[in-house]
């Protein structure tokens, strides 16, 4: 009998345009019309809690009634939709930019993960990583930190990061635009730009891990590459527990400029041409920006951590 350890997934989580990934909540949003009433109710509550909207509940109103009243609003402010440009520009951009594409996978409502912990000008992707790992821990069914302490911190690994780079005003975009705009670059921006900073943050802020960590970049397959690295680390016996994933926050001008130059991205013009071709009218339906099957207009940018 082989003595090679068998890797097992013991929990998963994250934050996506559909909300929390743990407990299959994001999947519930995708299949919302086919879900049971209880699953729908649980999903709506999860988004309202995630976005800290429970404070809006009236004194004589129950959470169930509040969630029922907010159902349409939650569905409207999740998944791919028209980007809330004013919010993203204020929070994450260095300069205004006339977007060729105004649809994308923005996090639910105006969710800003960096406001949920003591961040110090942290890029959005790193804030998403902290929120995402907390969500994953809630899905495990056991105390992850105690397990890490039991195995030893040198036996806990982490492979996570982004495919492009961290590119908001607190990272890559802030670094590269500071000099042309007559501003001073922060001493943090170049380090926050590094793709593997997600793994570094999880180790430093969450797990206190001293084990093997790193990051493999593979475009759309980045999380899969990191998963493979984690599997091999456990099989080798070098780690007992490994955190793997990816964190992307690329609803930023540099990403739009790059993907548009490639001719690979869905734009308002391409969507309008496609809608005309399919007889769907001239008013742009931003919820149909992403069409993975059949006729489509290209890729769609989004923010997610998983």
Per-segment meaning from a language model:
Residues 223:
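Short conserved active-site loop signatures built around small residues
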Residues 191, 216-219:
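Glycine- and other small-residue-rich loops at beta-strand/loop junctions that grip anionic moieties
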Residues 238-242:
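Short, high-confidence coil segments that cap the C-terminus of an alpha-helix
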Residues 256-260:
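Short low-complexity, flexible loop/linker segments enriched in glycine and/or proline
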Residues 226:
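Active-site histidine-anchored catalytic micro-motif
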Residues 1-164, 170-211, 232, 247, ...:
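Conserved "HGTGT" condensation-loop signature of ketosynthase/thiolase-family condensing enzymes
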């Amino acid at each position: 009998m082989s003595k090679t350890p068998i890797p097992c997934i013991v929990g998963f989580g994250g934050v996506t345009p559909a909300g929390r990934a743990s407990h299959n909540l994001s999947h519930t949003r995708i299949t919302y019309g086919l879900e049971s009433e209880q699953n729908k109710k649980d999903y709506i509550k999860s988004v309202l809690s995630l976005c800290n909207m429970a404070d809006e509940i009236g004194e004589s109103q129950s959470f169930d009634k509040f969630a029922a009243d907010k159902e349409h609003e939650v569905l409207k402010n999740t998944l791919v939709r028209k980007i809330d440009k004013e919010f993203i520009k204020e929070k994450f951009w260095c300069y205004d930019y006339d977007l060729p594409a105004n649809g994308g996978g923005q996090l639910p409502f105006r969710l800003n993960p960096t406001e949920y912990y003591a961040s110090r000008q942290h890029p959005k992707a790193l804030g998403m990583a902290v929120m995402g790992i907390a969500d994953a821990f809630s899905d495990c069914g056991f105390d992850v930190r105690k397990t890490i302490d039991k195995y030893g911190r040198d036996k806990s690994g982490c492979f996570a990061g982004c495919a492009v780079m961290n590119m908001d005003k607190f990272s890559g975009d802030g670094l590269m635009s500071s000099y042309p705009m007559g501003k001073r670059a922060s001493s943090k921006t170049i380090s926050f730009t590094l793709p593997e900073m997600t793994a570094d943050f999880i180790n430093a802020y969450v797990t206190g891990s001293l084990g093997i960590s790193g990051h493999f970049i593979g475009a759309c397959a980045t999380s899969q590459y990191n998963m493979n690295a984690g599997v091999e680390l456990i099989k080798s016996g070098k780690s007992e527990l490994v955190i793997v994933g990816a964190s992307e926050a690329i609803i930023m001008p540099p990403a739009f400029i790059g993907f548009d130059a490639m001719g690979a991205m869905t734009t308002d013009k391409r969507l309008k041409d496609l809608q005309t071709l399919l007889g769907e009218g001239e008013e742009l339906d931003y919820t149909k920006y992403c069409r993975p099957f059949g006729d489509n207009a290209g890729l769609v940018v989004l923010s997610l951590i998983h």
